[in-house]
C-alpha cells in the first residue's frame, strides 16, 4: 500500500512492524 493509504505514523522511518508494506 502507498504511504498515503496508511496511518501517518507508518510514513516515518521508524514505523512499527504493522506498517510493513506501507511506503
Swiss-Prot record:
Its main location: secreted. Disulfide bonds join 3-11, 6-19, 10-22. Signal peptide: none annotated. The keyword Lyase does not apply. GO terms for molecular function: toxin activity. Keywords: Disulfide bond, Knottin, Neurotoxin, Secreted, Toxin. Causes abnormal twist followed by immobility when injected into C.elegans. The presence of a 'disulfide through disulfide knot' structurally defines this protein as a knottin. The cysteine framework is VI/VII (C-C-CC-C-C). This is Augerpeptide hhe7a. It comes from Hastula hectica. The lineage of its organism: Eukaryota, Metazoa, Spiralia, Lophotrochozoa, Mollusca.
